[in-house]
Amino acid sequence: MNNTEIIENASKVLEAIDAAKEEELRNLNSLVQPRAPLNAGSTPGEIINEIKHLSTRDQEGGTSSKDEEESGAGRTVAEGAATRDHKYSKSRPKKQPRSGLQSGAAGKNPTPDGEGGDTCNRELDQHSDGDGHSNTEGASSDLASIQPCQTDDAPCSSTSYLDEEDEPAVRPKTQCKQSGLIESKEDEDGMLSELHEQHKGRSKRLSALGRVNSSPIPSPRPDELLKKGIGESIVWSGRMTESLLSHGVIQCVPGSDRYQSGKSVSVADAHLNARSACWTQNKEPQCHITNSPSDTSTDNASRSELRTIEEEDYLQDDDFEQSIEDRDFDPGDWDPSDKHNDNGLLLQILKNQEEILNRLKTIGSIQESLDSIKRIQSKQGLALSTLEGLLSSVMIAIPGSGNPGSSVEINPDLKPMLGRNKNRALKEVSDELTPPNQFLQKQGMTIQQAVKPKETMFPPAIKTGESSAKGFHPKENLVSRTVINSIITARVNNPELAAKLKLAVAKAQTKEELERIHKSIIKNLKN
């Protein structure tokens, strides 16, 4: 069900509710303007006409047999009849009713014709409610005491003789006279049946909602099932086109009873005749046809005949290619009866496609490997460029023998470093004591040339009187005083002694005093 159908159903329900509200308002307005009440001298015919008018007004206003109107009409009739009976009971003396008439009114004194003594006894007006149970309500319950009777001997009256104190229980007294509106017994019976039909229907206030609620929820037919997924991931779902609304509330989606998980599918759930094609390499194709699922007598036999296709029954790659070459795919020569012969080819195609998909999944990992290689290559290029920049500013100084007569150009931008080769960058780090003798070199004589390193190539010697890594020698400055105070704070644990030493450092004026304080502190810490 799509959203459009849901919105349409919801709008229909809202319209039905609005129509029911309007009908209820019209009924209330009609009840505000009642007719003139019945007086004490109303006849049974007038009472019946009043009830008929009320039921007709209910039908015109869109409602029938409402409990409120029926109870109101019953109370009006009962009050008028009770008032009249109370008036007659006061004006006339109390009499005991005849036993024959009393039994005849109750239907217990049979006549020669085989019927009750009360030939004009009317059945109570009954109407069925919404559940089909017969109930006597409203005016019918109050008119149960109004039973006009007419015997063969003389007219009689069915009265209820009670004390005057029991006024609420007094029933109306009617004369057994033929009313001008009732000409015959057939007309009376017809009118009573008409009243019975008028009061039999149930209320139409929410009839539109009843129609919506009564709409059955359709079950998915086999031809409307949709297959989603391949292999074992199969889900069957039906298309629901009918309304699933109930009183404006969207119901939950009903669960599907036709779902079969995995490959455990029974033959009874097959929509058509199930066929299974079996292919082998050197055999003709065989097909086992099962019976229809509706035939219950052969259901077990069809299940035993149905077999699954094993992997070794599939066509191999060579056989598949050979079968493709041998077959003629002319559409005019294709026979629908050979449909089961193509099942093996289709299975092989699906198998090949699955293998291709599995291989295509490795493309992602290959792409990730290529990206990592590119990142490593960029890092290596950056490292090589850095080393190249460092090597361009370095001169390797290799002490040793070489060509002493070679002229060397001194590059002040290069930094000398030690190496394994000899005679390279030697003139930058050494001084020649004696110039080379060209005459002796021409005669082939080996001359040892004296070489002295430059003094600037060695670091200066450590001075004993100055502070260095070898030792601390205080001076007359703020830095030396701060160093001594730091030593006192870190090494002296006695607070009183530390305070005295800091006070002595502050009072020292000469270099000798600071040295004496420093030596005493170091000596005490060593001990």
UniProtKB/Swiss-Prot annotation:
Recorded family membership: Belongs to the morbillivirus P protein family.
Subcellular localization, as worded in the UniProt entry: Host cytoplasm
Species for this entry: Tupaia paramyxovirus (TPMV)
Ranges annotated as biased composition (Polar residues): 135-161, 285-301
Record keyword Phosphoprotein present: yes
Gene Ontology CC annotations of this record: host cell cytoplasm
Region spans: Interaction with the nucleocapsid (N-RNA): 479-527
Matching Pfam families: Paramyx_P_V_C (PF03210), Paramyxo_P_V_N (PF13825)
Subunit structure: Homotetramer. Interacts (via multimerization domain) with polymerase L; this interaction forms the polymerase L-P complex. Interacts (via N-terminus) with N0 (via Ncore); this interaction allows P to chaperon N0 to avoid N polymerization before encapsidation. Interacts (via C-terminus) with N-RNA template; this interaction positions the polymerase on the template for both transcription and replication.
Chain spans, region Disordered: 29-225, 285-319
Record-linked InterPro entries: P/V_Pprotein_paramyxoviral, Paramyxo_P/V_N
UniProt KW keywords: Host cytoplasm, Phosphoprotein, Viral RNA replication
Annotated spans, Multimerization: 312-400
Name of the featured protein: Phosphoprotein
Gene3D superfamilies on file: 1.20.5.110
Notes concerning its domains: The N-terminus consists of a long intrinsically disordered tail. The central part contains the coiled-coil multimerization domain (PMD). Forms a four-stranded coiled coil structure. The C-terminus constitutes the alpha-helical domain that binds to the nucleocapsid (N-RNA complex).
